[in-house]
Amino acid sequence: MNGALGLIETFGLISLIGAMDAMLKAANVEPAGPIVKLDGGVVSAMVRGDVSSVRAAVEAGAEAAARIGELRAAHVIPRPGAAIVRAFGADASSGGGAK
């Protein structure tokens, strides 16, 4: 993957939906795989795009998640290795967003 992968993890689906909405509106990114449901109400999602867009999106998503509910973690991986992308089911068909 030439671009970046942005990850966000929240407690509760509503916080994650708010975070994803903010991320997709804030920058030229697109979802990269399904929402992952973990134990205890923890959920996570990924976006992909160019590095600067993913950084801006994750920052906006983290702020939204914290405002709505509980942000657990947020992280950007520039140029993730192919094994990481495959392991987590991220769609890596392009490095940029599709807006």
Residues covered by each model-derived region:
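Long, contiguous binding/interaction regions
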Residues: 1-41, 46-99
